Amino acid sequence: MRARGIERNCQNWWKWGIMLLGILMTCSAADNLWVTVYYGVPVWKEATTTLFCASDAKSYETEAHNIWATHACVPTDPNPQEIALENVTENFNMWKNNMVEQMHEDIISLWDQSLKPCVKLTPLCVTLNCSDELRNNGTMGNNVTTEEKGMKNCSFNVTTVLKDKKQQVYALFYRLDIVPIDNDSSTNSTNYRLINCNTSAITQACPKVSFEPIPIHYCAPAGFAILKCRDKKFNGTGPCTNVSTVQCTHGIRPVVSTQLLLNGSLAEEEVIIRSENLTNNAKNIIAHLNESVKITCARPYQNTRQRTPIGLGQSLYTTRSRSIIGQAHCNISRAQWSKTLQQVARKLGTLLNKTIIKFKPSSGGDPEITTHSFNCGGEFFYCNTSGLFNSTWNISAWNNITESNNSTNTNITLQCRIKQIIKMVAGRKAIYAPPIERNILCSSNITGLLLTRDGGINNSTNETFRPGGGDMRDNWRSELYKYKVVQIEPLGVAPTRAKRRVVEREKRAIGLGAMFLGFLGAAGSTMGARSVTLTVQARQLMSGIVQQQNNLLRAIEAQQHLLQLTVWGIKQLQARILAVERYLKDQQLLGIWGCSGKHICTTNVPWNSSWSNRSLNEIWQNMTWMEWEREIDNYTGLIYSLIEESQTQQEKNEKELLELDKWASLWNWFSITQWLWYIKIFIMIIGGLIGLRIVFAVLSLVNRVRQGYSPLSFQTLLPAPRGPDRPEGTEEEGGERGRDRSVRLLNGFSALIWDDLRSLCLFSYHRLRDLILIAVRIVELLGRRGWDILKYLWNLLQYWSQELRNSASSLFDAIAIAVAEGTDRVIEIIQRACRAVLNIPRRIRQGLERSLL
């Protein structure tokens, strides 16, 4: 009875133990997530990289000496692709855009490079003896205009072919290009110098150099992309919800101008006001127009250019006569300009909450700031814009209160002056533009305004704006405001339930060597350490390649005048090398992780919930790759290092597993090193057997003591042998040999070893048999219970299937009955209606008969 109770309790324990084990296995299986590497995920990060140019220069200008050197650009894509990004919101900031800085540096480099072969005018930094030029008849009549008085006839000494000889030459200079050395203005003759001599070097533009802007497309190299904001009312800063990706920007004309933006793009709907901080009067304001205003500029023909030698092989091209000079001007439609100013004023008043918007001329400064400066046909015009910016607008009444010009004139004429010494974009150098011997006529479109705000009392209803400019970055911002460069990150990690099948250390113990010898030390540990070194070397090799390419680029930039590479050629080389570096870097990481050639690569790195505790469904069903990348961005480096360590350990395990094949060679069995291993293993086996024997003896003794057995003395004597006259089993009592008699003890080492091995094998056999019987019983019980459960579920399924069929049949019958009854009622109603209609004549006849009676 006691044995049955124990057996019954054991059965209950086994039952509950199996249930608990199943629950634990289910929970562990549900929680086990592993890191999986994905290559080609749509993830990007803000970056700064070298952009290269694309242009159709040949379709615009056949002159090969254009200052923008766009012939070195790659051809534009005839079918540019623009891919819209759905459900993507990206932040843009036109005021902190590296594309603007890069374009600014490119324009400076292009100016420097195009003027390198031209004549340096350093010898002209001498004293100029200047006076007002007289007409050919020797008199200066009253009909000399103010612009004509703006020129000086200057004489100066230059070096001849013989360096110790000086020669006096004459040339005409614009008054804006020279400054007096002394303050003596009482006489007509004073000493002057060129305006640039104390600030920057000067170079005369080559005769064949042209300044006609050609559209430039900035393109991102492989591994990078350009994001474009397509919101029609985007002001340049903040989030943009309508985002697309392009490889190149639209064609941007590098027009260098102040106050007015020329030949740019237009706003699509309404005038857009852009400023880094509109309330800060120190920040410039860019007004992006939605309709262009045409401006036409001209300068009549003059055959007045002369060649003045200034040294060995050098010449200065100057004006010989000013017969009709000074008639440069520009015309703008008054109606178009008034309409444009009205829209700009309305937008400014709305943003600043002001009712009176005033436009006034520039408050002062360099000619480049106080006038509208630009290049027209090779000459640099400086036009007075006081006629454009001299009006007041009442926002509440939507009308123009005052306007300086006479409204009867259809055009606004801007008087322009021409300068020949022009500060370059960066202000570090100057250029001397020789006079052009032809009629100059150019037409441009005003697409934007550069404004500054006076500031003052905040609670005032008035606000004054003046034309500004001077920082060419604002010109480039007006076109690049909707672009930003991002770096594509194709490598992504995310948790999945898939685990890489690897060679684990526990499984390596059941190898070929273990089958023969039982225990094997960790072989090839040195090879494993070397594998780690190889990983480090691979990374250093990649770093060396990148460093080498950077050194090459620096050398090319330093020697580009010897290699005859243009600025665009350098950028194309940088872009191509950068693309190779990006590809090699990604492939190197995939190779280190053991994922070469795979787009989805599982690992055996467990996912840590501290990186992200979101559920698997929440990650894969509700999050985009960009959102997921932002969430785990702080742990990406750690995850990468864990994947690398895991792959390194995997390679080490594989190497050790392959090293087990050396036991297949019988020749190695006779090696003295292997024999030492055999002896060591034999000693370990003998020691293990002795230890097991001692443990079993102690356990047996303890068990007998618990049952009341007293151990014998250690001085137990051997039983005395029987005599020949008393053979065994022939004593008086007869029968079997007494149980209390001692048996013969074993003598000899081999006999003891054999007896211990026999006892150990029997013990192991009995225990193993009991374990197998218990396992068979458990499997039998589980099978029986499982079969019963399956039969129960089958019966339950059949029952509910029958119930569903009965319910469906009942429902169908009820619907059929209801439809039949309804149909009968409808038919009956129709019949009654028809009878009523048919009985109408009869009722009329009966009524007439009754009335006649």
From Swiss-Prot:
CDD domains (alphabetical): HIV-1-like_HR1-HR2
Renumbered residue ranges of the record's region V1: 130-153
GO BP: clathrin-dependent endocytosis of virus by host cell; fusion of virus membrane with host endosome membrane; fusion of virus membrane with host plasma membrane; positive regulation of plasma membrane raft polarization; positive regulation of receptor clustering; viral protein processing; virion attachment to host cell
Region feature V4, mapped onto this chain: 383-416
Record site: Cleavage: 508-509
Cytoplasmic side: 703-853
Keywords: AIDS, Apoptosis, Clathrin-mediated endocytosis of virus by host, Cleavage on pair of basic residues, Coiled coil, Disulfide bond, Fusion of virus membrane with host endosomal membrane, Fusion of virus membrane with host membrane, Glycoprotein, Host cell membrane, Host endosome, Host membrane, Host-virus interaction, Lipoprotein, Membrane, Palmitate, Signal, Transmembrane, Transmembrane helix, Viral attachment to host cell, Viral envelope protein, Viral immunoevasion, Viral penetration into host cytoplasm, Virion, Virus endocytosis by host, Virus entry into host cell
Region (MPER) residue spans: 659-680
Further facts: Inhibitors targeting HIV-1 viral envelope proteins are used as antiretroviral drugs. Attachment of virions to the cell surface via non-specific interactions and CD4 binding can be blocked by inhibitors that include cyanovirin-N, cyclotriazadisulfonamide analogs, PRO 2000, TNX 355 and PRO 542. In addition, BMS 806 can block CD4-induced conformational changes. Env interactions with the coreceptor molecules can be targeted by CCR5 antagonists including SCH-D, maraviroc (UK 427857) and aplaviroc (GW 873140), and the CXCR4 antagonist AMD 070. HIV-1 lineages are divided in three main groups, M (for Major), O (for Outlier), and N (for New, or Non-M, Non-O). The vast majority of strains found worldwide belong to the group M. Group O seems to be endemic to and largely confined to Cameroon and neighboring countries in West Central Africa, where these viruses represent a small minority of HIV-1 strains. The group N is represented by a limited number of isolates from Cameroonian persons. The group M is further subdivided in 9 clades or subtypes (A to D, F to H, J and K).
Protein name, entry field: Envelope glycoprotein gp160
Organism expressing this protein natively: Human immunodeficiency virus type 1 group M subtype D (isolate ELI)
Gene name per UniProt: env
